[in-house]
């Protein structure tokens, strides 16, 4: 039944180079931690189903963008078709935190006329001893932009599931309330197929046969 | 007629979730605007830079348009095989011919297994009536046997008409049976598109790309049909395993294709605007250089290559790595090579051509192994074959996407766009051959549809790289004026 999902959300994961975007996504989609990985070229793709309520599945299509500056013009093009995003910084790398503003400004410009629901993610929280960004200041920044803040670790599998599912739930609520709607020519949210109202052709055949009798 | 009314209800509910959602949205008129625009855009010639229209609506439209008829069509296989000839047999017939002539090679080699193959083809392609087809196969096989001897690859021929249509047919086939006229219409439109091009013999796949819709759009459309079908047939969950389009998407093939198309379109726009800004001699020189690039892109002989024995793992890996190094991009085709080698490992360990009773003694089969692979595993082989082809194709598209990204934004390299184009062209040939020989390994239980689709996807993806290389040529020129 895995093909059956209520909606498909396209999420984008952004943030400075080496903050751990690909590792976070791989932990979430593949359930494992890849110690070494090459820098992402352009963009990569992952997907996973999330059950937000019993029987209600959302398919997440996750766009893993390159953090490197040289690919910026490519990744920019992807904001527009995303409904949600994880904005990552590395809690052991102050610079990546300072660049959060820049990332938000950039998305603001390129996402129009749509908008993206962002969550701010302080990654590599297993490395607490090397921490350069306090939880408090990160929370303050997130609040200033109306985002949630969460700290995660791909290595120790801390909050990875929560980061994605909370964001998915928030978007789902917005969709349910009609604040976000499925739109022509926009890939952010797509509706899926609902199994319980579907009748297979077999049944149709049977019912016809009964009629003929 | 009363029976139709009874049947109509479930069909309506089928489409309900989608329609419901769309009714909720305030900007509904924009949707209907696009609907009216759609049919006319179909007949338009090439507008590859055109903003991609949403296709969900088109399928909705088709569904609602034909609903009454669809209800009767949906009544079952019997109904379809009787009713279809009146409405759409012309279509079936025309693609059937090309399908059959390409299938005949398979038929010839398999010999006794003819009904097997037909059955297999029937389930994969969703051909309505096996008996009709089998008669035709026998005719076609007889006609073409002489011309197409065994050494003609079952996948080398059908790049043009057949592959385009079979893309639609293969994936919508099931819904033809269960879903009815909308799917038929869908196939019909695709068929007409191809026929309208009036070139059934053409070998290279301009087909998918040169029409109004982009390749990834066509594929997405097809995949959504498959998904719809899959969710309809909740009882036959296992069949999802053999749906090429769904699997291709699962391996992120569609996403990479979409990303590649974005890069391609962007580059195309840039190239055009640069050409517009130039004049006189400058323009002429550039045009000439771009012309050379285009030639490199049409050099690839995708088919009719002489048969080669299956290469060892090292050979393929070596060859693709070598070609890759000629591109001078900071990436390696490891994932592709891995996927390819996994497929061959699987074949050599668990398949080893169990069903074939070939005279040729290549890969002789141990008796016990043959027993091991009982009939029950035919489904597995089929599923694995489709899966492998889908994976390998997706990996190839991913590779092309990465190449595009690196050509556009990689570090400067001492390599000309022309050289890269030639390497790419060779790579395309290599990949298509590889897919063809992989599918040959699966021949006994496979239709040729998977491989020919795979090959045409790859070739189309290759063509998408042309604008990328063009802009890179232009940029190199402007950045290295002394050179």
Swiss-Prot record, chain A:
Pfam family, one: Ras
Membrane topology field: Lipid-anchor
Gene Ontology cellular-component terms listed: cytoplasmic vesicle membrane; Golgi apparatus; neuron projection; plasma membrane
UniProt-annotated binding residues for GTP: 17, 20-23, 37, 40, 67, 123-124, 126, 154-155
Sites of S-geranylgeranyl cysteine lipidation: 211, 213
GO MF, one example: myosin V binding
Activity: how regulated: Regulated by guanine nucleotide exchange factors (GEFs) including C9orf72-SMCR8 complex, which promote the exchange of bound GDP for free GTP. Regulated by GTPase activating proteins (GAPs) which increase the GTP hydrolysis activity. Inhibited by GDP dissociation inhibitors (GDIs).
Modified residues (Phosphoserine): 201
Binding site for Mg(2+): 22, 40, 64
Keywords: Autophagy, Cell membrane, Cytoplasmic vesicle, Golgi apparatus, GTP-binding, Hydrolase, Lipoprotein, Lysosome, Magnesium, Membrane, Metal-binding, Methylation, Nucleotide-binding, Phosphoprotein, Prenylation, Protein transport, Transport
Cellular compartments annotated: Cell membrane; Cytoplasmic vesicle membrane; Golgi apparatus; Cytoplasmic vesicle, Autophagosome membrane
InterPro entries registered for this protein in UniProt: P-loop_NTPase (IPR027417), Rab39 (IPR041818), Rab_GTPases_membrane_traffic (IPR050209), Small_GTP-bd (IPR005225), Small_GTPase (IPR001806)
Region feature Switch-II, mapped onto this chain: 67-83
Any one GO biological process: protein transport
Principal location listed in the UniProt entry: membrane
Major enzyme class: hydrolase
Subunit composition and interactions: Interacts (GDP-bound) with C9orf72; C9orf72 in complex with SMCR8 acts as a GEF for RAB39B. Interacts (in GTP-bound form) with PICK1 (via PDZ domain); a PICK1 homodimer may allow simultaneous association of RAB39B and GRIA2 to PICK1 which is involved in GRIA2 trafficking. Interacts with isoform c of RASSF1; the interaction is strong. Interacts with isoform a of RASSF1; the interaction is weak. Interacts with the DLG4/PSD-95. Interacts (GTP-bound) with HOPS complex components VPS39 and VPS41.
Record remark: domains: Switch I, switch II and the interswitch regions are characteristic of Rab GTPases and mediate the interactions with Rab downstream effectors. The switch regions undergo conformational changes upon nucleotide binding which drive interaction with specific sets of effector proteins, with most effectors only binding to GTP-bound Rab.
Protein's job: The small GTPases Rab are key regulators of intracellular membrane trafficking, from the formation of transport vesicles to their fusion with membranes. Rabs cycle between an inactive GDP-bound form and an active GTP-bound form that is able to recruit to membranes different sets of downstream effectors directly responsible for vesicle formation, movement, tethering and fusion. RAB39B is involved in autophagy and may function in autophagosome formation.
Protein name, entry field: Ras-related protein Rab-39B
